[in-house]
Amino acid sequence: MSRSETLFANAQKHIPGGVNSPVRAFKSVGGTPLFFKHAAGAYVTDEDDKRYVDYVGSWGPMILGHSHPDVLDAVRSQLEHGLSYGAPTAMETEMADLVCELVPSMEMVRMVSSGTEATMSAIRLARGFTGRDSILKFEGCYHGHSDSLLVKAGSGALTLGVPSSPGVPAAFAKHTLTVPFNNLDAVRDLLAEVGQEVACIIVEPVAGNMNCVPPAPGYLQGLRELCDEHGVVLIFDEVMTGFRVALGGAQAYYGVTPDLSTFGKIIGGGMPVGCFGGKREIMSHIAPLGPVYQAGTLSGNPLAMAAGLTTLRLISRPGFHDELSDYTRRLLEGLQQRADAAGIPFVTTQAGGMFGLYFSEADEIVTFEDVMTSDSERFKRFFHLMLDGGVYLAPSAFEAGFTSIAHGDAELKLTLDAAEKAFAALK
């Protein structure tokens, strides 16, 4: 038995499914999940000392690559001063100032400890601000695991093959309205019928939890206009896209301004962090300024602020995101060329430093239906063939891939060499 197999067997005794987040269990791709013990740069190393080029990046945060020395130094320095105070710190204000500088729509910001907390809090705030109960989300979009958002969700919910989670009361779900992603007419029709009841529309600007589906041309701007027409708060869930597709997030990349935004992953530099924010008019309703309650024991904790501030400053250098996008483009072009040469139907998508891989006959991937008709069985085989070749992809056909600035020519060659062999084996 490999050490990962032994560790997984032991883990299942006291951890449900042997993992602390479902997609890690490899249920979607089969086999034993890898247990990692080290990560540096573009690589992760498992418990059996095999090293892999990593395109998961801890599900998005590691945009600098793993174990960046400046981030580690910042955390070590803060360790000397304590782990958590449960009181305000200067770094929290520095973080808020920097986020508001980098993302112009953010006039005020509240730190939390996860992306789920951020989206949950933003929706509560939108409801409190508008006095309305219903929310509108999109099929296949995932906004964390709070009850009202696990309706027709993506990410792990798709991996499990269930559109919604048991344990979500019907009374909660009835206030969550869903329409297809990238279908502006469906939004228009629904708001024409019940717009006066809808507090907010929450959307991933790039749907990164049904792999990676960019918005159709004009889609985000159309949502902006419909929200303005019906007095609905527009929330961009940028937990995944924030600071990755562009320094100012997807809202800068696509030129559409939301009312509220949520962030996570990169903003913590690998530590557990999230935040939500937006218009001062709306944020002034959050406690202690207003009546909408939100709190957190570890919100704005100094270790996370140290890691996050350092990360955001490093990725702010001119040219950073151009380099990240260029590597991702070269990766996808190389994969497409090798799939075509092998006669394998294959489609890729990209938004900055995130990407999607689909075994599909479709000309392009635009809708949830396009995603669901891709060949997940072929992806399973491809995943394990790439793993054998030293490349770690997300262990699900429904999860986006991520590149980092640590990925370079050597990693690209290794990845494409492994892919060429994998595509040949898939014939």
From Swiss-Prot:
Q: What class of enzyme is it?
A: isomerase
Q: Which residues are reported to carry the modification N6-(pyridoxal phosphate)lysine? A: 265
Annotated disulfide bonds: none
Give the primary localization class: cytoplasm
Please give the Gene Ontology molecular function terms for this protein.
Answer: glutamate-1-semialdehyde 2,1-aminomutase activity; pyridoxal phosphate binding; transaminase activity
**Any Gene Ontology CC annotation:** cytoplasm
Query: Which keywords does the record carry?
Result: Cytoplasm, Isomerase, Porphyrin biosynthesis, Pyridoxal phosphate
InterPro entries, per database record: 4pyrrol_synth_GluAld_NH2Trfase (IPR004639), Aminotrans_3 (IPR005814), Aminotrans_3_PPA_site (IPR049704), PyrdxlP-dep_Trfase (IPR015424), PyrdxlP-dep_Trfase_major (IPR015421), PyrdxlP-dep_Trfase_small (IPR015422)
The reaction(s) catalysed by this protein are: (S)-4-amino-5-oxopentanoate = 5-aminolevulinate
Where's it found, cell-wise? Cytoplasm
Pfam families (alphabetical) = Aminotran_3
Q: Which GO terms describe its biological process?
A: protoporphyrinogen IX biosynthetic process
* CDD domains found in the cross-reference section: OAT_like (cd00610)
Cofactors: pyridoxal 5'-phosphate
Pathway connected to this protein: Porphyrin-containing compound metabolism; protoporphyrin-IX biosynthesis; 5-aminolevulinate from L-glutamyl-tRNA(Glu): step 2/2
Membrane-spanning segments: none
EC number from the UniProt entry: 5.4.3.8
The record describes its quaternary structure and partners as: Homodimer.
Q: What is this protein called?
A: Glutamate-1-semialdehyde 2,1-aminomutase
Which species is this record about? Answer: Pseudomonas syringae pv. syringae (strain B728a)
